[in-house]
Amino acid sequence: MTSSSSPSRKALSKIACNRLQKELSEWQVNPPTGFKHRVTDNLQKWVIEVTGAPGTLYANETYNLQVEFPQHYPMEAPQVIFVPPAPLHPHIYSNGHICLDILYDSWSPAMTVSSVCISILSMLSSSPEKQRPTDNDRYVKNCKNGRSPKETRWWFHDDKV
């Protein structure tokens, strides 16, 4: 997998283009609550504004997600990261990488950008405290040069937050 900063990213397949155009059309009609697609002319890279849910630690806070779609989306998961500054959360690293199983091992082609966004908002909303992952400094140090979070071998051990 190439990093997000790689200029050699492959063009989307016809299936991926059709799927993303459909998802974008549906999003424009019925966006998930708390999210706003920031319009660009690049179907392969979306920027999505996330607003924390009312009554949570992140209420009224706004963050940006960057979603990069691989050539064979939806058969392959998109790369989803928070554009720094990332929210303080036990599963979100300071470089924006997100430890969430559906972005990696548990990805299914039935998932959509909307369902991923809802999962991320749910993860934020359920957090009882704002803090970085305990291994944040070590992980970020090892992710230099724009390494993709999809190159990480994640260990999903905590589903409480």
Swiss-Prot record:
Residues 15-161 form the UBC core domain. The keyword Electron transport does not apply. GO terms for molecular function: ATP binding; ubiquitin conjugating enzyme activity. SMART domains: UBCc. The active site is at 99 (glycyl thioester intermediate). Its EC number is 2.3.2.23. It holds the Pfam family UQ_con. Pathway: Protein modification; protein ubiquitination. One of its GO terms (biological process) is protein ubiquitination. It catalyses: S-ubiquitinyl-[E1 ubiquitin-activating enzyme]-L-cysteine + [E2 ubiquitin-conjugating enzyme]-L-cysteine = [E1 ubiquitin-activating enzyme]-L-cysteine + S-ubiquitinyl-[E2 ubiquitin-conjugating enzyme]-L-cysteine. InterPro entries: Ub_conjugating_enzyme, UBQ-conjugat_E2_core, UBQ-conjugating_AS, UBQ-conjugating_enzyme/RWD. Keywords: ATP-binding, Nucleotide-binding, Transferase, Ubl conjugation pathway. The keyword Zinc-finger does not apply. Belongs to the ubiquitin-conjugating enzyme family. Accepts the ubiquitin from the E1 complex and catalyzes its covalent attachment to other proteins. This is Probable ubiquitin-conjugating enzyme E2 18.
